[in-house]
UniProtKB/Swiss-Prot annotation:
Protein name as it appears in the record: p-hydroxybenzoic acid efflux pump subunit AaeA
Cell compartment(s), UniProt: Cell inner membrane
Annotated source species: Salmonella schwarzengrund (strain CVM19633)
Purpose of the protein: Forms an efflux pump with AaeB.
Membrane topology: Single-pass membrane protein
Gene, per the UniProt record: aaeA
Length: 310
């Protein structure tokens, strides 16, 4: 009897342990596959591609790569003497046409005052037409002067905002063309996190929900708020052929890969360039409130850390 009881006890204990293990594995699987988190997240920032609006030789480069600059700080300067001469020429044209317009205005006024009693209507009309032509030339010269002045101002390339100069690839003595990107400026205090969440996890992602961001290789946890969720992503399995007909890729019905949707997360505190734009992180959406880490069990903390390893 005792032997039978002992066997039943062992069987019952084994069965209970198996059931508990199954429940633990099932909960871990659900937690891993359905909870709103992703390792596919990246720090991003607003980046300005700085390109000159004039062409010429670069005479001075006032910054170095990865330097923190202030708004309106001079980055580099393009050949100013050429544009100064162009402005001087334009100003000389304006001065010439101003004098000429004054002469033609006096002549037209005199003829209009004398009237047809002293000269023909044709001569009066001719004087008025000449005045209008000169005034048109004066306006054109003034526009050319204003453009030359603008070009001269734009030979000095300034930072459009506070930020970090990166990928600086211009040097004094080089010729740069109009519109060619010379340097990128990563705006200060513009960093955010772009998390690519699987579509199966979007149920737990809403604008305003709180988020935890763990940079790769760091134990520090940053806080943030879901700012927005992308309204659509590209359908990679559907394209059009040369005649505009739909081309659909073949898929296995029993294998469905979840699409990833961009989710923009606003950081509570800007971290400068401690984690540069493009570096990766793990993001966990905790819901309407921040997670109280002090209340987490050992297994929950372990699950959070396992996310770092996939």
């Amino acid at each position: 009897m005792k032997t039978l009881t002992r066997k039943l006890s062992r069987t019952a204990i084994t069965l209970v342990l198996v059931i508990l293990a199954f429940i633990a594995i099932f909960r871990a699987w659900v937690y891993y596959t359905e909870s709103p988190w992703t390792r596919d997240a990246r720090f991003s920032a607003d980046v300005v591609a700085i390109a000159p609006d004039v062409a010429g030789l670069i005479t001075h480069v006032n910054v170095h790569d990865n330097q923190l600059v202030k708004k309106d700080q001079v980055l580099f300067t393009i050949d100013q003497p050429r544009y100064q001469k162009a402005l001087a020429e334009a100003e000389a044209d304006v001065a010439y046409y101003q004098v000429l317009a004054q002469e033609k205005r006096q002549e037209a006024s005199r003829r209009n005052r004398l009237g047809v009693q002293a000269m023909s209507r044709e001569e009066i009309d001719q004087a008025n037409n000449v005045l209008q032509t000169v005034l048109h030339q004066l306006a054109k010269a003034q526009a050319t002067r204003d453009l030359a002045k603008l070009d001269l101002e734009r030979t000095v390339i300034r930072a459009p905002a506070d930020g970090w100069v990166t990928n600086l690839n211009v040097y004094a003595g080089e010729f740069i063309t109009r519109g060619s990107t010379a340097v990128a400026l990563v705006k200060k205090n513009s960093f955010y996190v772009q998390a690519y969440m699987e579509e199966t996890k979007l149920e737990g992602v809403r604008p305003g929900y709180r988020a935890e961001i763990t940079p790769l290789g760091s134990n520090r946890v940053l806080k943030g708020t879901v700012d927005s969720v992308a309204a659509g992503v590209t359908n990679a399995s559907s394209t059009s052929d040369a005649k505009g007909m739909a081309t659909i890729d073949s898929n296995l019905e029993w294998v469905r890969l979840a699409q990833r949707v961009p989710v923009r997360i606003r950081l509570d505190e800007q971290q400068g360039n401690l984690w540069p734009a493009g570096t990766t992180a793990t993001v966990v959406i905790t819901g309407k409130q921040d997670r109280d880490a002090s209340q987490d069990s050992f297994f929950r903390k372990l699950a959070h850390r396992l996310r770092e390893f996939g």
